[in-house]
Amino acid sequence: METRSENVLEVCDLRTHFRTDDGLVKAVDGVSFTVKRGETLGIVGESGSGKSVTCLSAMRLVSKPPAFHPTGAIYFGDTNLLSLTEPEIQKLRGERLAMIFQDPLTSLNPYLTVARQLTEVLEVHQDARPAAARRTSIEMLERVGIPDADSRIDQYPHQFSGGMRQRVMIAMALLCGPEVLFADEPTTALDVTI
């Protein structure tokens, strides 16, 4: 029999509902799955079936209110993510749990350079010094196929094509080597080379 600690992620009867002016919306209604370390799980469904909300719920990124979880649990190892305080979940996000969002244009801050957005991840989660964080960020941009990464890192998101912005999002999600990576249509804007 498998134990909870054998699974890196276990979602049990997750329900994410939203209270709206038009009534209750059951975006996720009874989803369960497990992911073992090193395993890949694909969630497939029609548009609007709750795939993105499932990932956002697991990362604790749905706004409460209007969202709420009438039942369910999301275990990361032996820890139920739904029972954590906001500071506790923030310690896990970015370092041990990461997400590549569907739309990099709205996920990247247009007022900050790519360098600032990438290095902040390392400075916050790994106490990296600015120079080391910059070096690691440039290396990650190179790994995801951004040419001239050492100069492009100082540009703003609007100076990148859609595919290059998506590569920045992938680099950001991978920077800390997370144990669980949620990828919400991560290759929509990419060419086939990544």
What kind of feature is each model-predicted range?
Residues 181-184:
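Catalytic Walker B motif of ABC-type/P-loop ATPase nucleotide-binding domains
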Residues 44-45:
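The feature captures the beta-strand-to-loop junction immediately N-terminal to the Walker
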Residues 118, 170, 194:
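Hydrophobic anchor residue at the start of the ABC signature
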Residues 19-22, 60-65, 83-89, 112, ...:
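ABC-type ATPase nucleotide-binding domains, specifically the catalytic core motifs of the NBD
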Residues 175-179:
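A short, proline-enriched helix->beta-strand linker immediately N-terminal to the Walker B motif
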Residues 69-80:
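Conserved ABC transporter NBD signature motif
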